[in-house]
Amino acid sequence: MEKTDAKDQSSQGDEEKDPPKSHPYSVETPYGFHLDLDFLKYVDDIEKGNTIKRIPIHRRAKQAKFSTLPRNFSLPDSGARPPAAPPLQNWSPVVPREASLGTQEQNQSPPLGNAPQASTSRSEVSYHRKALLAEATRQLEAAEPEDAELTFGSGRPQLLRASSMPATLLHSRASEEPGLSLGPPAPPALPPLQGEGSVCDGTFEPAEGLAGFHSSSPRASTRIPELVQEGAEPPEGVVKVPNHLPLPGPPFSFQNVLVVLEDKEDEHNAREAEVLFTPGSPTPSPPPLPSPIPENELLLEEIELNISEIPPPPPVEVDMRSIGIRVTEESLGLARVDPGSISSLKQQVSALEGELSGRTEELAQVRTALQQQEEEIKAREQRIRELEFTVAQLEGQFHQENAKDTQGQTDVMVNTDPVHGLLTRESCDKGIEVNLLGSMESESWGHRGEENGLLWGPDGHKQGNQSPAERVLLPQLSLPQGPEQVLTSSVHSFLSTELRIEEAGTEQEGGPQGGTRGAGGFLWGSDRKTPPAGREETSSNLPGKEHPGRPPSSPTDATIGQYVKKIQELLQEQWNCLEHGYPELASAIKQPASKLSSIQSQLLSSLNLLLSAYSAQAHPPKEPPASSSSPPVEISPSTSLKSIMKKKDYGFRAGGNGTKKNLQFVGVNGGYETTSSEETSGEDSTPEDLSDSEAEKKCDGPDHKHVKDAHLTCEAGQGIPEGTCHAAQESGPGEEVPHSKAERYKPSEEFLNACRALSQHLPETGTTTDQLLRQSLNTISQEWFRVSSRKSSSPAVVASYLHEVQPHSPHFLKLLVNLADHNGNTALHYSVSHSNFSIVKLLLETGVCNVDHQNKAGYTAVMITPLASAETNEDMAVVWKLLREGNVNIQATQGGQTALMLGVSHDREDMVQALLSCQADVNLQDHDGSSALMVACHHGNVDLVRLLLAHPACDSSLTDKAGRTALSIALKSPTHMEIAGLLRAHAEQGRSLGL
């Protein structure tokens, strides 16, 4: 009985899909074995794993393959074979097996099982397999004539082998196992060949006799030739076996039979199958296939053949692998990164991203808010424009309503006196608006000269052909006398009139240049410095008699008092309307620091003063000086209260020495600049007034420059009787005022009250935040600088203020004398700058004046003394006293100049000599390294150079920061050769004295 194992290939099942309908093909080998070529019937068993058992084979080392040998190469000791002979009849397989070739289908069923048989198409059989089948048939036929020789004379069968089988393989196997043969040497067992086809390993059990080897079926000898002759395609595997098996005489233990199969998948390689005959080999074999003869009933002659078909090796697959090289950070020299730090960094990144998103949202919200604010601002601006337009409309309506209610206007003139000839009147605008109900007829001097003195403004165009004498303001007041004097209906307009109070003036003789008429017929006084020569007279020369047309005692003053009260009522009514109509504006005006609030208070105070003055003059005793200096009133147009106050504040600027220049300490051109003396007066005492004064300078026109310097001083002392102002003005800087008149210059009650309030809190003056104290200090500062720090300031008024303040406290007197404005200038600075040495003397006599006080530019009163003009011996004596009490070597913070340098630069030889006498350092240098001598050389003043070189301490070799000396500066100009000679002589004299 035989057992056959077959292993199917995956590709074989694809090629053979249709089972054969005829009996399978089988091949009988020369050794008597019947090979079944139909392997498909074992596929099911092979797939289930029930029939295959792997046999461990101990293989030797691989031998060299000789792939270049020819396919018909024979084993050694095998001679040429004769043509094919009939196969031996002594070989008969125990179980006949038939091999089916692809295209030939037979109905004979295999003896073992009914497995389906696969057929292959003709196109799928390779040419190489046909050649192998033909070669196997040819070798079997050629081996038949030599069967007898091989059977009895040779112990080695002739085997078919693949082209890669080495020729020395059988010799080596025979030499290794020589003791296994019992008679003649048996053919050695060949090692398995490593091929690429299928390998059939057959293990033959030992036989007790050789009779089984000689019995064979004639079917095997004729089967293969029939297949070749019929042209059938070769099967999938070809079993190459010899047609003889050597039959030695004595019994042998085993025989080796080599069977080589070639797989259909690889046409170029072959595997070898080793068939071993062993007498009782314990080598396990695959489980036998079902057979009609049990294994235990097998005779010795029966040989079991195990055939297993090894599938071809899988195709070579190319694996692509990514090879990574692991390198540690330590080997690269890098710092090891802590995984915790990485996680923390990730957390930080996420936190930052969240914060960024939050900030982005906030930014978007801010942008939205900004857009909303911009829209709100635009809406507010639009609202403000609408309100301004509404205010303008309301003002226009208010003026129109007042114009409709107005039936007439009256120009009021107060305390006028008859004059002989033309008068040049200069006035101070008090800014009082008068709206009088009634009718007046405008009459000129030629019409009713003896009855009234009014000059009606709108009728001025009708009087252009009158004489100059007829255009003079008349001194008599005319009152309404009935409805017959009402003006025509064409003259209905609302005009504001001003009470322009003239403090002093000069008289002009008759002539066309005595006065000028305004566009509306008003008379304007010309500047007191501009009238022609020979026409100027003092007011004391005016006659003191009354006008013939004016009664000695008239009710004019009482009537004016009534009008003043009416003006007060109208102002109060106007304020009430402002509060009700525009409460926000009214609240802003009511602030203590508001300029409008100050103007309102001053206006009311002026009205009170006017009322009290005219009430006191109702029945006064006649005094020629008082009557001569009583302020006549002129009429001037105004458009608003603010413009009136501008005229009031700056109306004095054209008076006095209009062309004389003095200092304003603003740090320009060495710390000072030359401006009009009036610009440095008391209006600069507070920062609030400074901003207004700067704006008012732009509004200053030619109509505002007609008032004298003393007018505003008289206004500052609101409680001073008006008759004394002119007397103070007429007195010169060095003149003494009679004691009886000086007593009449008293500070205002507001000033005295502020002094009392401030004297109780002197330590808190510099740091106080109390609004009342600050207001008191502001009041004192304004009035003090108006009285003491102007070009027109009167020593008598200053003495009166100092006398009134001294009883309060000596400390308060020191505070008042050294009070500084926002530029750091004191009354002493201003008095020296204006050359008011009488006031300087008064300030020095107090004993509390700080002479070395520096302003913001770093200048003291001593430093600016060389710039003043001391015209008299008394003035020069004050200068010497000032220089002795102060430090003459103080340098300014701006530029480092000294008093001596300022005197030299302004060519003040007398002041330079006084400074040198008061121990002034002649060698001090400014920030540029220049000395007083260098400045004198630069200006080319030979006398000053000679005076400086005469000083024993003078050093002519000093150099400035540019490396220049006084001599090099003098040599730059060809006109300074005399100075260069003086410098050379001084240098030679110094060298000679040094030797």
From Swiss-Prot:
Keywords, alphabetical = ANK repeat, Coiled coil, Cytoplasm, Repeat
Compositional bias segments (type: Polar residues): 101-124
The subcellular localization recorded is:
Cytoplasm
Q: In which ranges do the ANK repeats occur?
A: 823-853, 862-890, 895-924, 928-958, 962-992
Q: Effect of altering residue 801 to H? A: Found in a patient with nephrotic syndrome; uncertain significance; no effect on protein localization
Q: Where is the composition biased (Basic and acidic residues)?
A: 526-549, 694-705
Is the keyword Coiled coil assigned to this protein? yes
Stored SUPFAM superfamilies: Ankyrin repeat
- Residue spans with biased composition (Acidic residues)? 680-693
Provide the Gene Ontology terms for cellular component. Answer: cytoplasm; cytoskeleton; cytosol; microtubule cytoskeleton
- Composition bias of kind Low complexity appears in 625-640
| Biological process according to GO | negative regulation of actin filament polymerization
Describe, from its UniProt entry, the tissues in which this protein is expressed.
Strongly expressed in colon, liver, lung, skeletal muscle and kidney.
Q: Where is the composition biased (Gly residues)?
A: 511-523
- Residue ranges of coiled coil: 343-404
Q: Map out region (Disordered) in residue numbers.
A: 1-29, 68-127, 443-467, 503-558, 617-642, 663-705, 721-740
List the InterPro entries.
Ankyrin_rpt (IPR002110), Ankyrin_rpt-contain_sf (IPR036770), KANK1-4 (IPR047184), KN_motif (IPR021939)
Q: What is its main location?
A: cytoplasm
Outline what the protein does: May be involved in the control of cytoskeleton formation by regulating actin polymerization.
Recorded protein name is: KN motif and ankyrin repeat domain-containing protein 4
Q: Source species, please?
A: Homo sapiens
Q: What is the lineage of its organism?
A: Eukaryota, Metazoa, Chordata, Craniata, Vertebrata
Gene name of this polypeptide: KANK4
